[in-house]
């Protein structure tokens, strides 16, 4: 059950953007606040909030920032209605792209996303044009270390409901169904494991290798999308060239 999921390839580009712009805590904080607003501030009674808090912890978001985000739900977000919207389209050279937005203004979001696509050699498509190329899965990423036995971790993950276990150079990747993600994550947490990533996301069925020229265009498109305050996540099926840097 080992394989190459391209996690480092994609995560390196995403982390680079998030670190450069300092946006990640703001985006996750928004998710926490809205999850608390919709389902209540108690994580024990709100599975969605539990999942987002796990995502926050995996990204090293401070505890006080998480608590402030929950309190926002009863304050400044009390009268604001946010919608989750999924945009689909193609990046340069036909890269399949999904953009997950959380917005209080659909017209603003649609305009910004459409502009990001068209300006960088892509085009925004209709619903369903690329989503069939992706599967929604829970993904838990754990950094390798000398104290972790790969065989034991794999058996533990599969026994508590994981669908797949992969080993990359520096990480283990545990994949679950969306429905089992919470229970698998909580079981592993109870065993004292810490995560580099823990969230439900869209994972492409296959990846498309792109050249350096396309990579440069596409990275600029990703920069613009991930800098948008309404955009929460961007998923794609591009595999950047080995060792490529912007």
From Swiss-Prot:
Gene Ontology molecular function: DNA binding
Where it sits in the cell: the answer is: Cytoplasm
**Which key words are in the record?**
Cytoplasm, DNA-binding, Transcription, Transcription regulation
Q: What is its main location?
A: cytoplasm
InterPro entries found in the cross-reference section: Integrase-like_N, TACO1_YebC-like_2nd/3rd_dom, TACO1_YebC_N, Transcrip_reg_TACO1-like, Transcrip_reg_TACO1-like_dom3, YebC-like
What's a single GO CC term here?
A: cytosol
User: GO:BP terms for this protein?
Assistant: regulation of DNA-templated transcription
Organism encoding this protein = Hathewaya histolytica
Matching Pfam families: TACO1_YebC_N, Transcrip_reg
Q: Which PANTHER family match?
A: TRANSCRIPTIONAL REGULATORY PROTEIN YEBC-RELATED, TRANSLATIONAL ACTIVATOR OF CYTOCHROME C OXIDASE 1
**Family recorded in the similarity comment:** Belongs to the TACO1 family.
SUPFAM superfamilies referenced in this protein's UniProt entry, alphabetically: YebC-like
The molecule here is called: Probable transcriptional regulatory protein ORF2U
């Amino acid at each position: 059950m080992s394989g190459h999921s391209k996690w480092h390839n994609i995560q390196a580009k995403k982390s680079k953007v998030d670190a450069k712009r300092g946006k990640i805590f703001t985006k996750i904080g928004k998710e926490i606040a809205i999850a608390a607003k919709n389902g209540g501030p108690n994580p024990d009674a709100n599975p969605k909030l539990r999942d987002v808090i796990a995502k926050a912890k995996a990204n090293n978001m401070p505890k006080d920032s998480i608590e402030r985000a929950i309190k926002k739900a009863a304050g400044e977000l009390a009268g604001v209605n946010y919608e989750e919207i999924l945009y689909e389209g193609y990046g340069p050279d036909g890269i399949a792209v999904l953009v997950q937005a959380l917005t209080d203004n659909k017209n603003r979001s649609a305009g910004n996303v459409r502009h990001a696509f068209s300006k960088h050699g892509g085009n925004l498509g209709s619903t369903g044009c690329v989503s069939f190329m992706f599967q929604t899965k829970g993904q838990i990423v754990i950094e390798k270390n000398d104290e972790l036995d790969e065989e034991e971790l794999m058996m533990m993950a599969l026994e508590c409901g994981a669908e797949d276990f992969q080993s990359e150079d520096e990480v283990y990747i545990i994949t679950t169904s969306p429905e089992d993600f919470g229970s698998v994550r909580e079981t592993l947490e109870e065993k004292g494991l810490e995560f580099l990533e823990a969230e439900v996301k869209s994972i492409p069925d296959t990846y498309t290798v792109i050249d350096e020229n396309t990579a440069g265009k596409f990275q600029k498109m990703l920069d613009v999308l991930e800098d948008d305050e309404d955009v929460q996540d961007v998923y794609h099926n591009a595999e950047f060239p080995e060792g490529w840097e912007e």
